[in-house]
Swiss-Prot record:
Domain RCK C-terminal positions: 202-288, 292-373
Official protein name in the record: Putative transport protein YbjL
Subcellular location: Cell membrane
Pfam family, one: Asp-Al_Ex
A single BP term in Gene Ontology: potassium ion transport
Species per Swiss-Prot/TrEMBL record: Escherichia fergusonii (strain ATCC 35469 / DSM 13698 / CCUG 18766 / IAM 14443 / JCM 21226 / LMG 7866 / NBRC 102419 / NCTC 12128 / CDC 0568-73)
Record SUPFAM superfamilies: TrkA C-terminal domain-like
Transmembrane segments: 8-28, 32-52, 66-86, 94-114, 158-178, 383-403, 406-426, 451-471, 475-495, 540-560
GO cellular component: plasma membrane
Similarity remark: Belongs to the AAE transporter (TC 2.A.81) family. YbjL subfamily.
Its membrane topology: Multi-pass membrane protein
Heme listed as a keyword: no
Length: 561
């Protein structure tokens, strides 16, 4: 039996789609030196190659892909977007505006200089900024801008072509810039990170290991009684001196949870909770009594929970003000917008921040109720909320405003982004509403993006050879300019107008470009995860602005429509 693969794939859109995805994901795992191609570029390359062979896919699959992707971007940005936008992020907002705004203006100028149409120009902007949201926003706006069928088809093909020709240019140039730009300015990033660490008490150890606290029991000996000198537990401040706290005391066969007024006596058996290294550093006064192996005394369930900051008595407070250790809890991580932050007593908590806390289950529950709620560990997605807000986003995108003969609408991309932000924000404030496990959210987001990339590659593949011959050199120059010049402008603005700390500034610049590989290079150069503070500050805002940039570049293009 002979099987015609070409006819088989052309006759089955679903099969073609998953063949493109599988081959593209395999290609994306390849590395060029220290740079991995990545899933997006892998799928794009495979789809372009198959597109040259005149394979095509249903455009509805492409539309669904970009809708799922942009909605999930909004859900991820939602928990911290408003707090950054309205309160904590004036500098970060301005940096993101400078980065995206300058790139938009430069792209418009280069597009007109080289005589390109809106499709090539918007695609070049998206590729040079390595930003799929720009591509999504521009494509959606083109479809709803009243352009004729032939002109629309050409613009969409050129949009994909421009993106494909400049994506690697944008990615590689930014990674190279992230490695060498810090060396061209007079302040060393490592020194800048150490400086702000001293000012704010930051833990600059980016490779800090996290351990669960353990419980061990000791019998109180004469040395420990003499050390206490008749003081109660509150006066002793045992945690400050040892890194451990007393969870239980057995006295005369009676087991009790001590309060601050308890005084240790000879023969007491005490259960100490702390990290392993804290136990190892205990003064001999604690260990000279015989270690006790008492099942009841040691019966304690240590848990680690992710606590979401919500309550007004925690939002806006510094970490030190929570006094977690006074409540028998240990802080392992602070996560903001899916980015791990340095553990700093002076970090001001935002609504939606996630604190990873360890300790006795009862104590962790108490502290969680005081500052917010324990993140649900269910693997069940609230599909009703997901679908409802998706519908709301589509309806927002249908709204149009008429000004004389000119009409303006948000489009599906902006509508879904806004609806996703609202869902993410409400999820951060209401523990029982709209829960989507991070794994499920990442899977839907990644799948939507891959479907979208497959669609744009298949539609643009037939014209890529002509495009390379006619405009390849121009695209190379334009891609480098749009990728690097806004970064330099952003650096000058942040360094000499906002006068930001260089470690925070470079992190914020990479956040404004939403480029995680470049962020890793900045952290390595600084030998610190302090730049993550700046990255988190601009990342959520930049995702929104980049989507809007794709819409704006189409709307302001002269003579369109």
């Amino acid at each position: 039996m002979n099987i015609n693969v070409a006819e088989l794939l052309n006759g089955n859109y679903i099969l073609l789609l998953f063949v493109v995805l599988a081959l593209g994901l395999c290609l994306g795992k390849l590395r060029l030196g220290s740079i991995q191609l990545g899933n997006s570029i892998g799928v794009l390359v495979v789809s372009l190659l198959l597109g040259q062979q005149h394979f095509s896919i249903n455009t509805e699959a492409l539309n669904l892909g970009f809708m799922l992707f942009i909605f999930c971007v909004g859900v991820e940005a939602g928990p911290n977007f408003f707090s950054i936008f309205f309160r904590d992020g004036k500098n970060y907002l301005m940096l993101a505006l400078v980065m995206v705004g300058s790139a938009l203006l430069i792209a418009l100028g280069l597009g007109k200089l080289f005589g390109w149409d809106i499709g090539l120009t918007a695609g070049m902007l998206a590729g040079s900024m390595t930003s799929t949201p720009v591509l999504v926003g521009a494509g959606d706006t083109l479809r709803h801008f009243g352009i004729s069928g032939t002109e629309l088809s050409s613009a969409l093909d050129n949009l994909s072509l421009g993106y494909a020709l400049t994506y690697l240019i944008g990615l590689v140039s930014l990674i190279v810039g992230a490695r060498y730009l810090p060396k061209l300015q007079h302040q060393d990033l490592q020194t800048s990170a150490q400086q702000i660490a001293r000012e704010r008490g930051l833990d600059t150890d980016a490779t800090r290991k996290v351990y669960l606290p353990v419980i061990r029991a000791y019998r109180v000996g004469p040395e420990l009684v003499a050390w206490t000198d008749g003081k109660n537990l509150r006066e002793l401040g045992i945690y400050r001196q040892t890194g451990c706290y007393i969870e239980r005391i057995r006295r005369n066969g009676i087991l009790a949870n001590p309060d601050g007024d308890a005084v240790l006596q000879m023969g007491d058996e005490i259960a100490l909770v702390g990290y392993p290294d804290a136990h190892a550093r205990l003064d001999p006064s604690f260990r000279n009594g015989k270690e006790v192996f008492d099942r009841d005394l040691l019966d304690m369930r240590i848990v680690t929970e992710e606590v979401v900051v919500k309550n007004h008595n925690a939002v806006g407070k510094r970490l030190a003000q929570l006094k977690l250790t006074d409540h028998g809890c240990f802080l392992n991580r602070v996560i903001r917008s899916q980015i791990e932050m340095p553990i700093d007593d002076n970090v001001v908590l935002n609504k939606g921040d996630v604190l990873q806390v360890s300790g006795d289950a009862r104590r962790v529950k108490t502290i969680a109720d005081r500052i917010g709620f324990i993140s649900i560990h269910s693997q069940v997605t609230d599909l009703l909320a997901f679908c409802a807000f998706f519908i709301i986003g589509l309806m927002i995108g249908m709204i149009t405003f008429q000004f004389s003969s000119f009409s303006f609408g948000m489009g599906n991309a902006a509508g879904l982004l806004f609806a996703g932000i609202m869902l993410g924000f409400m999820r951060a404030n209401h523990p029982t509403f709209g829960y989507i496990p991070q794994g499920a959210l990442s899977m839907v987001k990644e799948f939507g993006l891959m479907v979208f990339m497959a669609g744009v590659g298949l539609s643009a593949g037939s014209g890529i050879n002509n495009g390379l011959g006619a405009i390849g050199g121009q695209m190379l120059v334009a891609g480098l300019i749009v990728s690097l010049v806004p970064v330099v402008i952003c650096f000058l603005f942040g360094a000499y107008v906002l006068r930001m700390n260089r470690a925070l500034l470079f992190g914020a610049m990479m956040g404004a470009r939403t480029c995680a590989p470049a962020m890793e290079i900045i952290s390595d150069t600084a030998r610190s995860n302090i730049p993550a503070l700046g990255y988190a500050g601009t990342y959520a805002i930049a995702n929104v602005l980049l989507t809007l940039a794709g819409t704006i570049i189409v709307m302001v293009w002269p003579g369109l429509g």
